[in-house]
A protein has these predicted regions:
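Short, small-residue-biased leader/transition segments that mark boundaries at the very start
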Residues: 2-3
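Short, charged/polar "capping" segments at the starts of alpha-helices
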Residues: 26-30, 145-146
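Flexible gly/pro-rich beta->alpha loop and the following alpha-helix that scaffold active-site loops
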Residues: 47-100
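Nucleotide donor/acceptor-binding cores
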Residues: 13-17
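Short helix-loop-beta junction
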Residues: 35-46
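Conserved anion/nucleotide-ligand pocket segment
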Residues: 132, 137-185
Length: 211
């Protein structure tokens, strides 16, 4: 719950409106129950958006939100649904008007130009995302054994020129489109900018705060 409190604090509102979007799991019910269990403990107004049940009026709901919180799951399927409903453009408008955009896994990479995803069962892939924030992002950097070698491979193949690589139990706070700092809520976890220098991967850790 520590990082969720941190997300709420970024709104600078006493009682922020926060909206959970669990599209990447097909609007999984237990995910929504967990969300409300956590956020009803805090001083906020939690809501959510379904796309696989009857969907609320997005054009009126999104502009009212101080924070958007996106769950993990299948990034490719999530973005396809959002585009079909026009949510991508509504979120862009909200972002440009100062709404805090946040999320985990698929909900973290979706804001960037590109993300490293396991949406396809057979392999990791670099996929285009919303492009609100410059850069390429990889979650689960230390949690899933295939992640670090894949980042090294796509760097060496010149498919990407850097990767904002985020370990488990860590968040990357992006401020004004620029990575601001890592937020560690685990045991000595960090986020890195991985680049290729003289043929070898260099991982530069971001400045970090510990919660």
């Amino acid at each position: 719950d520590v990082y969720k409190r941190q997300i709420l604090s970024l709104s600078n509102k006493e009682k922020p409106n926060i909206c959970f979007i669990p599209t990447a799991t097909g609007d999984n019910d237990s995910y929504k129950v967990n969300y409300y269990d956590v956020f009803t403990k805090f001083n906020c107004n939690p809501t959510h958006i379904d796309f696989f049940k009857r969907t609320i009026d997005l054009s009126s709901h999104i502009p009212e939100q101080d924070i958007i919180f996106v769950g993990g799951g299948n990034t490719k399927s999530m973005l396809a649904v959002w585009k079909d409903w026009g949510l991508d453009e509504l979120l862009r408008d909200a972002y440009e008007n100062g709404t805090v955009m946040s999320g985990v896994s698929a909900g973290a990479i979706c804001w960037f130009e590109k993300g490293i995803t396991d949406s396809w069962a057979h392999d990791l892939a670099v996929m285009d995302c919303l492009g609100f924030v410059n850069g390429i992002c990889c979650p689960h950097y230390d949690e899933e054994p295939a992640r670090r070698p894949f980042v090294e491979k796509v760097l060496k193949d010149n498919l990407i020129d850097h990767c904002l690589s985020v370990e488990g139990n860590c968040a990357l706070h992006v401020k004004n489109d620029i990575p601001h700092r890592a937020i560690n809520f685990g045991k000595n976890k960090n986020s890195y900018n991985a680049t290729l220098v003289n043929g070898e991967v260099l991982e530069e850790a971001f400045e970090r705060i510990d919660l």
